């Protein structure tokens, strides 16, 4: 089974995760074509940095103007449906998983306001996050990734609304090993993608045969360990009885495997 492992070291955004997949070999021109086919602006920024100590790829979708004052759960569902309707209707349900986790975390962080009415801008969510999610799925599709795993990591308690939301979202990420990562550095939407899309949070071991390693960074000039996410592409094999307690679905398609 072709799999992707994600390892977070510090700062984490959706764009960093996309940048890592470009570093993995997904052509930017392919991503632009997917945006165009979905009726979305093609004005993203991407830049490799092969001379840095950590060779990583920078990617960013700049914010656009003239946005509504509030951004609520219903808006995410509506916009996402429009994005997926043209070329990838099968991805609509995948987005729902992310949004459900996101709004639940936002509700916990923002005065327990119900998830369906909380303003998601208060925790840093924007419409551009949906475009980045679409490109992340498109990149996985290009690489023929069948399932996604995240390496466990420990986190600190959040202080701001965004940090508290990230902490509330990352219920499966908790590990007692290693230096805790500040939730203030983890974008809630990126946290929701890890939590909503990962088949499991588990360490890489002998069952995973890595083929390629790539990095995405939030810095175009100085990628470091703290502002870089690592992504490992390879093959996951397991002959054990059960890894997960549920029948796994791979990006909206039944994998046919009880793991």
For every predicted segment, state its role.
Residues 114-118, 207-210:
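Short coil/turn segments at secondary-structure boundaries
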Residues 84-92, 118-128, 153, 157, ...:
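Flexible, glycine/proline-enriched loop segments at strand-loop-helix junctions
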Residues 1-5:
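Extreme N-terminal starter segment of soluble prokaryotic enzymes
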Residues 23-111, 172, 181-184, 191, ...:
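Glycine-rich nucleotide/cofactor/substrate-binding loop typically near the N-terminus or early
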Residues 6-19, 118-144, 255-257:
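Conserved phosphate/anionic-ligand binding catalytic regions in large, soluble enzymes, centered on
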Residues 103-106, 114-117, 124:
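N-terminal glycine-rich phosphate/adenylate-binding segment common to multiple enzyme folds
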Residues 28-30, 139-257:
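Mobile "lid/hinge" segments at catalytic clefts and subdomain interfaces of large enzymes
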Residues 9-10, 38-39, 127-129, 152-159, ...:
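Acidic, glycine-rich active-site loops and adjacent beta-strand->loop/helix elements
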